[in-house]
């Protein structure tokens, strides 16, 4: 999957769950629970290969990645506390 498709996937999952997201250029960032979720890939262009969806905590000084999930659904499940 490419990063642009990953953004569309994240937006669709947010729409299903009534969660918010913001478009920043071609990228998108979702807010779920206490996390911000965004697709991460290499290279960092719309046609770059997706590595996963990162979950980060706001207001951290080092902005380290808290967790990297394979799909937008799993990332949002983790962020909102939904268990399988």
Protein language model features and the residues they cover:
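Compositionally biased, low-complexity segments enriched in small residues
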Residues: 7, 20, 67, 73-76
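Negatively charged, low-complexity tracts enriched in Asp/Glu with abundant Ser/Thr
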Residues: 1-32
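Short, compact, well-ordered microdomains
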Residues: 53, 69-70, 77-82
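Short intrinsically disordered terminal tails
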Residues: 1-4, 80-84
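Short aromatic-glycine-(Arg/Gly/Cys) micro-motifs in beta-strand/loop hairpins
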Residues: 33-62
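A short, exposed loop/beta-hairpin motif centered on an aromatic-Gly-Thr core
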Residues: 29, 56-74
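Terminal low-complexity, poorly structured segments
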Residues: 6-8, 15, 46-47, 51-53, ...
């Amino acid at each position: 999957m490419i990063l642009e498709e990953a953004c569309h996937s994240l937006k669709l999952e947010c729409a299903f769950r009534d969660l918010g997201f913001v478009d920043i250029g071609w990228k998108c960032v979702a807010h779920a629970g206490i996390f911000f979720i965004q697709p991460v890939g290499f290279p960092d262009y719309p046609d770059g290969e997706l590595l996963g969806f990162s979950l980060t905590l706001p207001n951290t000084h080092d902005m380290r990645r808290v967790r990297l999930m394979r799909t937008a659904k799993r990332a949002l499940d983790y962020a909102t506390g939904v268990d399988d």
